[in-house]
């Protein structure tokens, strides 16, 4: 898996500064929380469609339909230009995809906040809170949602 991620990110047509450490952290959180391998693999691959040349068909072939479906659900629609609209559409997409996609989304936000050294943008914090609130409203609280809630308490609304 690490070789696939490194190859994908080394040959990507993607944003600068995105390395394999973040996807690995996103995969480790659900693994450590006892989630099934499909969720762990989707965590490892959650950004690969946005950030690399990897296609949904390639994901389906290499990792199966369940992983491909989850990764697609976690991929934002870059055709939506406005940040708020794009993130709202992503939140709906994740909620509609089911609790496994929600777990990976929580892990993604948690891993980002775990590695941050300074206050994230207000709109990013607002997106994380809206994601957390939507997931808890639909699927209830979990260890990952509680962890993200604690992380977000470091940055009160401004």
Where are these regions (language model features)?
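Active-site helical microenvironments for divalent-metal-assisted chemistry
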Residues: 1-158
């Amino acid at each position: 898996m690490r070789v696939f991620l490194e190859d994908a990110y080394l040959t990507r047509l993607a944003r600068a500064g995105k390395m394999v450490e973040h996807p690995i952290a996103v995969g480790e959180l659900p693994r450590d929380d006892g989630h099934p391998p499909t969720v762990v693999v989707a965590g490892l691959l959650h950004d690969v469609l946005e950030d690399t040349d990897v296609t949904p068909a390639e994901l389906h072939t290499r990792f199966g339909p369940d992983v491909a479906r989850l990764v697609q659900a976690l991929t934002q629609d870059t055709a939506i230009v406005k940040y708020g609209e794009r993130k709202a559409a992503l939140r709906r997409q994740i909620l509609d995809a089911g609790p496994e996609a929600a777990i990976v989304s929580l892990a993604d936000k948690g891993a980002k906040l775990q590695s941050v050294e300074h206050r994230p943008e207000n709109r990013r914090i607002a997106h994380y809170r809206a994601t957390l609130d939507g997931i808890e409203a639909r699927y209830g609280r979990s260890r990952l949602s509680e962890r993200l809630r604690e992380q977000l308490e470091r940055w009160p609304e401004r």
